[in-house]
Amino acid sequence: MLEFEFLQIAVGNRDKFLCCPSDEEWRRLFYFAQKQSLVGFLFCGIERLPNEQLPKRDLLLKWYGMAESIKKVNVIKNVRCAELDAILRKGNFKGCVLKGQGTALLYPYPEYRQSGDIDMWIGTSDGRLVSIDTVISYAKQRGVQVSHVDIKHADMRFFNDTQVEIHFKPSYSYNFV
């Protein structure tokens, strides 16, 4: 399958495709990249390809533009993670970045990792769990808009340009035996 071959190129396990993709195959690869949130990551594969295997110029430029946008968004999100951590420390909370931004550093090219919001689990500075009421009270004291609260997390508007989910339970089982 061409998609898996492309993933191998992106991670450095291959240098090129066995057969050069057609224009239609490149369009399908681009659609796959968009659908799987791999536009930036697979752009790294494009950068590794020999010139004769590159997609047509219009698709290449579109892909490049989207990859550069992802990099810019990640710069902002990384700054926001540090700012959020500082805000929470002022309230004697200790945070841990989860999921997207938290796992991006495990990628060969973290700047190209597409993620949604910032997910941060918080506890007390001495490692204890915090209640939802404590988290919401602290956020509201800082003028933070709080929406969608459930049993494990709450959406909080710390920043205008970045969505944040604060997790106050590290896990929750929906299945009870």
Annotate the PLM regions:
Residues 1-116, 122-177:
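Conserved NTP-donor binding/palm subdomain of two-metal-ion nucleotidyltransferases/polymerases, i.e.
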